[in-house]
């Protein structure tokens, strides 16, 4: 039985930053053709909100809603697939960490999905659920507690 090295807040924050860059890039690339065809011109947010050009405001609103929906869907796929298949996202892999069940077993797609849903609970109170990792004795965020997971140094098991 190896010693488990649970990963704390800052390393996890760097991993999620890497994942965020990858996800944001995927969303931007997937919506680039649409963005190119919309006529934002030199649109400023103030103009959109005040109705100076209502067509541009409608296009901007449509684009922002679509951007959020695509981001949500890609986030679901990204985190559920990577965590469910290998226990690690590219960000976690880069920093040599992975997600496991509290029993030490690898997580599956169901647990990965529950963990992803737990992200929303962690975000509800101004992201307190994520910062919880820094103060919890087991270094678990709320999403980890909901899914019954730990983030550990890769290669280490319970």
Identify the meaning behind each predicted range.
Residues 117-135:
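Hydrophobic, aromatic-rich membrane-embedded alpha-helical segments
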Residues 131-157:
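Hydrophobic alpha-helical transmembrane segments and immediately flanking/interface helices
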Residues 1-123, 153-158:
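Short, small/hydrophobic-residue-rich motifs at membrane-helix boundaries and re-entrant hairpins
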């Amino acid at each position: 039985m190896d010693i488990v090295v649970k990963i704390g807040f800052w390393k996890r924050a760097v991993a999620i930053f890497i994942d965020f860059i990858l996800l944001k890039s995927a969303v931007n690339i997937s919506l680039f053709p649409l963005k190119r065809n919309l006529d934002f011109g030199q649109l400023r947010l103030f103009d959109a909100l005040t109705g100076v050009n209502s067509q541009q405001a409608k296009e901007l609103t449509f684009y922002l809603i679509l951007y959020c929906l695509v981001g949500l869907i890609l986030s679901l796929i990204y985190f559920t697939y990577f965590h469910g298949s290998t226990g690690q996202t590219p960000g976690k892999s880069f920093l040599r960490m992975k997600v496991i069940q509290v029993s030490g077993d690898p997580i599956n797609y169901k647990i990965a999905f529950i963990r992803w849903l737990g992200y929303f609970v962690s975000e509800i109170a101004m992201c307190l659920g994520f910062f919880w990792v820094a103060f919890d004795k087991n270094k678990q965020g709320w999403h980890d507690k909901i899914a019954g997971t730990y983030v550990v140094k890769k290669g280490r098991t319970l």
